[in-house]
UniProtKB/Swiss-Prot annotation:
Gene this chain is encoded by: LECRKS4
Compartment list: Cell membrane
Name this polypeptide is given: L-type lectin-domain containing receptor kinase S.4
Similarity-based family: In the C-terminal section; belongs to the protein kinase superfamily. Ser/Thr protein kinase family. In the N-terminal section; belongs to the leguminous lectin family.
Record GO biological process: defense response to bacterium; defense response to oomycetes
Protein species of origin: Arabidopsis thaliana
Length: 684
């Protein structure tokens, strides 16, 4: 009995280390529902707006906010610190307009429990008996009070701290413009500031950058040559610490990206939560005082105020009301004039594409070099727009390097416009299905795209505070950025629900050829229905064709059946896209085809989870040896397609009723079905 208990205990310890080792990156755009992923202590709390408030305007208090799971900073058995990258947005609102303190720090520590630490100049990291810290730690401090004990250079500086509050290197706070001009930056000015910290383990160099904007500066504010291998342990905790002294400030964290496998993405500052700043309250009091004085001023000043009021009223009348979903999404709402100018009046030259949902335009935001994609919802798709807006209020918080980011929106009367990251290389389907594409994707590029999409789907299913089912995974909704990374886009059909709960049944929406058979039978959503669609994408990338090709030979009509027949006959190379000219990694191609068949199985119990798919693609698991049959059927007897469509992959339907064909073994149903009821185009 005791031996069994010991084995179980060892297994649990192993699984815990395995989970922590898989965590390479995370992203928070606001923290409204992030409390399960954070360890907060001291006076730290999550404000109603979704920002972390580390300290209040109370003297001599501390606050900590750490990611709840440890991060592996060294490979197993190797004493070498790995590279890491993080970006985060902070704001410090002082108790008095020009006086506050003490500051905050990004910290990497052996434990998230620092409750024995002191406030004031120790920033909640150390106490007076631990200045020579025996347990190693690393921090980047944003200090707003000069302390002679630690030889601070001034009361507005950034410093790198290693095992001590006396900075190894520090510099006055500031940032660099694109023309290399350095601008001063006041940390405790109540302004949102973004920070980037990048450690390169090969160069053994640490870079710190600041900016009050979304774009990452090219030049570093601090660049320090250091080997962190002797500082960081195998597993450490990452987070933030702040404190107040005789002077106090409210210290806020508005968003946070962390990455152990590449460069952390920059945060879009307009999309972050608002600061519940006491400065605003003081401003209102000052405005009331000014208003009282202005009543005693001359008739001329009064006339100017009246004219200004009329102008504001007219402008407010022209704007649509702000609804609850907009407040939940975040503060950034683009003006209609701004987006009209960005897209050259929504001109045809800027048109990227159109569909049942409306049109998408390329735009360049005024006063910026940033390109965006602007989706203008058509009036014909007005039904369902309110439902879609309620989804946007949640989906707008999603942030992952393999998702197309929603930057903001605009409402003007009945118009609804959504603003996304611009993807300069278009969608994956153009490269796979166009007869004469300008560029033929190499296998290396295809495999990279597949892994990116899988990572994005894993984040949707498991990595956010709610489970997100995309419901329309297909090559046309995989967009490619400037570096040909695959990003999942078009969340117009997505559904969200709490982890562990039952999403229930819903109407069947999606694209013909990508719908899981159990979805079309019962309408019940699961993450496995997304896995089924991803299986089609895997086979599309390997074979260079759509799931259903009505112009193909009868035996090649249904891609899954065709691939399976070649697999059984040992002619699997025959299905590989001929445009690759045989230049591919055969082991990777076979693995992708195996995974495609597994994900496309009619039985959801056979399909892997996206976490398992990612581990296969990252070669953490060997390629599956046994691939069960996907369940055959005679597609000629089981389909009813419009011959003029050219490809069933172009259908975007929702199914009122469907008659299922039973395969040769008469025990399963196929994903290919004929409609016995009517088919309508879903307004998107």
């Amino acid at each position: 009995m005791s031996q069994t208990f010991a084995v179980i205990l060892l297994l649990l310890i192993f699984l815990t280390h395995l989970v922590s080792s898989l965590i390479q990156d995370f992203s928070f755009i606001g923290f409204k529902k992030a409390s399960p992923n954070l360890t907060l202590n001291g006076v730290a709390e999550i404000a109603p707006t979704g920002a972390i408030r580390l300290t209040t305007e109370t003297q001599r208090v501390i606050g900590h906010a750490f990611y709840s799971l440890p991060i592996r900073f060294k490979p197993i058995g190797v004493n070498r610190a790995l590279s890491f990258s993080t970006s985060f947005a902070i704001a410090m609102v002082p108790e008095f307009v020009t006086l506050g303190g003490h500051g905050l720090a990004f910290a990497i520590t052996p434990t998230p429990d620092l409750r024995g630490s002191l406030p004031s100049q120790y920033l909640g990291l150390l106490n007076s008996s631990r200045v020579n810290f025996s347990s190693h730690f690393f921090a980047v401090e944003f200090d707003t009070v000069r302390d002679l004990e630690f030889e601070d250079i001034n009361d507005n500086h950034v410093g790198i701290d290693i095992n001590s509050m006396e900075s190894s290197i520090s510099t006055p706070a500031g940032y660099f413009l694109a023309n290399s001009t350095k601008k001063e930056l006041f940390l405790d000015g109540g302004r949102v500031i973004q920070a980037w910290i990048d450690y390169d383990s090969n160069k053994k160099r640490l870079d710190v950058k600041l900016s009050p904007f979304s774009e990452k500066p090219k030049l570093s504010l601090l660049s320090y040559d250091v080997d962190l291998s002797s500082v960081l342990g195998d597993e450490m905790y990452v987070g933030f610490s702040a404190s107040t002294g005789l002077l106090a400030s409210s210290h806020y964290i508005l968003g946070w990206n962390f990455n152990m496998s590449g460069e952390a993405f920059s945060l879009s500052l307009p999309s972050l939560p608002r600061i519940p700043s006491s400065i605003k309250k003081r401003k209102k009091k000052r405005q009331s005082l000014i208003l009282g004085v202005s009543l005693l001023c001359s008739l001329l000043i009064f006339a100017v105020l009246v004219a200004a009021s009329l102008f504001v009223v007219r402008k407010v009348k022209d704007e649509d009301r702000v609804e609850e979903w907009e407040l939940d999404f975040g503060p950034h709402r683009f003006s209609y004039r701004e987006l009209k100018k960005a897209t050259n009046g929504f001109g045809d030259k800027e048109l990227l594409g159109s569909g049942g949902f409306g049109k998408v335009y390329k735009g360049k935001l005024p006063g910026s070099d940033e390109f965006v994609a602007v989706k203008r919802i058509s009036h014909e798709s007005r039904q369902g727009v309110r439902e879609f807006m309620s989804e946007v209020s949640s989906i707008g918080h999603l942030r992952h390097r393999n998702l197309v980011q929603l930057l903001g929106w605009c409402r003007r009367r009945d118009d609804l416009l959504l603003v996304y990251d611009f993807m300069p290389n278009g969608s994956l389907d153009m490269y796979l299905f166009d007869e004469n594409p300008e560029v033929i994707l190499t296998w290396k590029q295809r495999f990279k795209i597949i892994k990116g999409v899988a990572s994005g789907l894993l984040y949707l299913h498991e990595g956010w505070e709610q489970t997100v089912i995309h419901r329309d995974i297909k090559a046309a909704n995989v967009l490619l950025d400037s570096e040909m990374n695959g990003r999942v886009g078009d969340f117009g059909l997505a559904k969200l629900y709490e982890h562990g709960s039952d999403p229930g049944a819903t109407r069947v929406v999606g694209t013909f050829g990508y719908l899981a058979p159990e979805l079309t039978k019962s309408g019940k959503l699961t993450t496995s229905t997304d896995v089924y669609a991803f299986g089609a994408v895997l086979l599309e990338v390997a074979c260079g064709r759509r799931p259903i090709e009505t112009s193909a030979l009868p035996e090649e009509l249904v891609m899954v059946d065709w691939v399976w027949s070649r697999w059984q006959s040992g002619d699997i190379r025959d299905v590989v896209d001929r445009r690759l000219n045989g230049e591919f990694d055969e082991e990777e191609v076979v693995m992708v085809i195996k995974l495609g068949l597994l994900c496309s199985n009619n039985s959801p119990e056979v399909r892997p989870t996206m976490r398992q798919v990612v581990m296969y693609l990252e070669k953490q698991f060997p390629s599956p040896e046994v691939v069960p049959a996907p369940d055959f059927l005679d597609a000629n007897d089981s389909m009813c397609l419009d011959e003029r469509s050219g490809s069933a992959g172009e259908f975007e339907d929702f199914v009122d009723s469907a008659r299922f064909y039973s395969g040769p073994n008469e025990t399963t149903t196929s994903s290919i079905f004929s409609f016995s009821g009517k088919t309508r185009t879903d307004p998107r």
